[in-house]
């Protein structure tokens, strides 16, 4: 069966026909990414960002192929780049919403950071996903599985969130590095190496080394150094 959204399965005490309708609804949501809430907040993607979306699609599809899964392309329309002043989450820089079938990303200052963040969110997008009709009297349609994350059947608890994030980030670090040889990132990689060499003794506020072998991007900003 052709994959029409990230949702692979519907769990719950409803008929098969109702489950099929939910899957179709998610497919329609995947195809329709017009959200009123994003009006005036989402900006147009740059040519470089569109090319990076294509590169990350190819790379994450190769990951799916390792596990015997078919390709699943995420169109640029499902990636929403939100302007800095409109971004609602102070700590987070991106998130995937399986119910809305889209990724929201705070606009990035570099191609390398955009690529790494998108790679992480696309792994979430392309991981196993299931939704459920909860077991409560006032049942509702919510997530059941996204990757390793599991919601209880009553919808009140979520397990393995930190594990899912850790595994996703480890896969991102390991496989996104394969894209760094692309010309889109060459200038930034050279800059990062220069900054790391210049500030090789730099530490964080908690006295840990600022840079390590997994540093993707670094930029000197006046008296501060920014890294990802």
What are these regions (language model features)?
Residues 139-199:
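Post-HExxH zinc-binding segment in Zn-dependent metallohydrolases
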